[in-house]
Amino acid sequence: MNMKLNQQGYSKEKNEMKKTFGIAGCGFLGNIVADAYKMGLLEDYELIGVTGLPLEAAVSTSVKVDCACCADIDNLIAMKPDYIVETASVAFVRENAVRILESGINLVLVSIGAFADAELYARAKAAAIKGGAKIHLASGAVGGFDVLQTLTLMAQAMNLPENANVETHTGCKGFMPTPVWEDELLTTQKTVFSGSAKEAIAVFPHRVNVAVASSLTTTGPDTTQVILHSVPNWQGDDHKITAEIDGVKAVVDIYSRTSAIAGWSVVALLRNIASPVCFF
């Protein structure tokens, strides 16, 4: 197998006009980004390296797009890409976000649920400032961050109270490996969780990135309310985000049968960064 493991830095002399990026996490979402690059949809960028577990998955992705396969995140950081796209996990973000940012590398995040931890969020922002880098939160399976952030700014400027909540309907089988599982969910629709976004990520670390991302643009993980409904025979997820102040109400409701939209949101974000016209 042609396994191009990278151990040294990458020379940017090859193409100074293009921004470079790497991918951390070579599963379903990471490969959507890699495939989009291969299709020519990220023409302003050069993909220089990937990493992920199992290593065989990273090797497969690297061969597909003809870039370096890094044995671990340290080797990818050593290549000094302009951006690292995270499509790995909440645990990866907790362990690596700060040092990536301190290295001066911009970080594009999918596993935003990690930032329900206010202390980690604060350290990541401080690391970004120290390293002169940016944290880019991909919209993932939802969207509307622009209007949600605008509404929150209005609330703060006019000293108005704001209410924000995220209501999700999803298939029952997604709750099988969680503390709320019971056999009744196979046949009966049920509300399995109601609480704050911070509480939700503690119980469902792999299912509520949407809630945490939305909360960061509105009232925060401690006060944004999350309601999760388990629905028998349901395919996909339906996320309804509502934020309201006196005189303004924003509702964003998005259904997706698979998580593919989260991977494509990264592609759209990278294109937006490189475009002469930015949509917020």
Language model features by range: what are they?
Residues 67, 103-105, 130-133:
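A short helix->loop->beta-strand "cap" motif at the edges of active sites that frequently abuts
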Residues 24, 32, 136, 141-280:
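Active-site-lining helix/loop region of Rossmann-like oxidoreductase modules
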Residues 5-61, 277:
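N-terminal Rossmann-like dinucleotide-binding module
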Residues 53-55, 112-115, 141:
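Short, ordered loop/turn segments at secondary-structure junctions
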Residues 54-79:
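Conserved N-terminal Rossmann-fold NAD(P) cofactor-binding segment
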Residues 112-133:
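Rossmann-fold NAD(P)-binding glycine/threonine-rich loop
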Residues 86, 109, 135-139:
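General beta-strand structural signal in soluble alpha/beta enzymes
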Residues 71-102, 114-118:
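Beta-loop-alpha module in the N-terminal Rossmann-like domain of NAD(P)-dependent dehydrogenases
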